[in-house]
């Protein structure tokens, strides 16, 4: 009998099921949480799309507790002081960071530390449109200064500045937002060329973005902007805000409460925009109903020098109030837990913490949430 007529030989290969790569969730939950805690937070929306199990862990309180153990999150606050001289005015910036205590025995205690930010050309001359990405701060040309295309990047881990790739055109007071791993800069230029451009963080290159469909280019001159979903929002005044859709440049206008608010008094947590208004208090924007709603359950002071930002899944509320020390003021912080339900968003306040006493002329310019 030929070999072709012989019956097939049995093999000792294992069944195909045993060749399947082990799942992440075959590991203990604590190990999975520690792995996720080391991933930069800007990738969390992508991970949420991978599986329901990942989405559940990323949206759980446990992930924030684990990140706290690693000291992954921090707030960077920048105050400015202005000194008047006979021939010129000088603006000086003072940086602080709010972070977890390095003492591993107490992972819930916060410390407010002054940090030394090296001088760089133009740094003390004008405020910037800053955007935090992982552990770096990208500085886009600000306002009250000749327009520029230069982008500066501050590495909070090394404590050093570096000059990034320049934009294609000079801008100032532009709308800036981070969407899908790219920085979008809209408006802020007087010419007709390149009304919007986008910076790819991977390739470190600028290219033209979809042309904004707003008829008036002044719609994008702003001093505060945020990102939600695939859109970048410009908060322009006490009456309205505009959105730019990064997919096609489409434009939409929304009303905002007629009240005083601060450039630093806005943030986005879990894809929800929060803004602190002097008269109405802390509010959030309901994108489904397209209206502003109050975060209920809070008793916040009608404070000035407001800064808010995400901090380990909670909202850090920072304000200043008069001090007993002459020509000084106190900087306070209160953490607010947020719980969303069918009826709205309920806030739970934690005890206030005195962060520092600073000179009375300290004015808050930036409040940035960074995550390692």
From Swiss-Prot:
Residues 1-21 are annotated as: Disordered. Kelch repeats lie at residues 136-181, 183-228. Pfam families: F-box, Kelch_FKB95. The keyword Repeat applies. SMART domains: FBOX (SM00256), Kelch (SM00612). InterPro entries: F-box-like_dom_sf (IPR036047), F-box/kelch-repeat_ARATH (IPR050354), F-box_dom (IPR001810), Kelch-typ_b-propeller (IPR015915), Kelch_1 (IPR006652). Residues 21-67 form the F-box domain. The keyword Repeat applies. Residues 1-13 have a biased composition (Polar residues). Transmembrane segments: none annotated. Keywords: Kelch repeat, Repeat. SUPFAM superfamilies: F-box domain, Kelch motif. This is F-box/kelch-repeat protein At2g44630.
